[in-house]
Amino acid sequence: NKTPLQVANKPNIDKIAALGRCGMLHTIPAGYAPGSEIANMSVMGYNVPEVFEGRGSLEAASMGVDIAQDEMAMRCNLICIENGIIKNHSAGHISNEEAEELILFLQQELGNELVSFYPGVSYRHLLKVKGGNKNLKCTPPHDVPGTPSADVMIKAVDVEANETADL
C-alpha cells in the first residue's frame, strides 16, 4: 500500500529532498509574542531584542517617515467597535480613501507639536509622539476580537509612562 506521492516519478523533488536538510527555524526569540513583525525581522537577521520597538517603527519606515531619537512611532489602527466590543480589527476593510480622510481629520483635531498622525494603507496608520515614554503595553486589535475595547486600551507599564498612555 503506497500513496500516490510514493508511487509518482518525481526525480526533481527526490533530488531536492536528498540534497536538502530538514529542521526547525525558530523565528521568535524567547519572551516575544509570535507575530509577523518579530518573525520577519528575525529571518532578515536583525537582533530583535536589540532593535525592535514595535510595529510603529516598521510602519514609519514603510511610509518614509523619519523618527528622531526623542520621538516614538506607534501603529495606529482603525477598528470597528460596536457597543463597546471590538467587532473587527480592520475597520470593516476600510478603503484607503476613507481611512485617509479619517486620519487627516484626527491630525487636524488632535495633532500638535507633540502628536502627529500619518495616513497609511487601509486600517494601518502611524502615530508619532515627540518625547513619549515607550514603557507601554499595547494590544494588537487583531489579537482580541470580541473583547471590550476598554479592557485593551494602551496601558502604562510604569508610572513614568502614564502621561503617554493617557494621550
Model segments located where?
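Glycine-rich, mobile lid/loop segments that gate access to catalytic sites or pores
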Residues: S90-L167
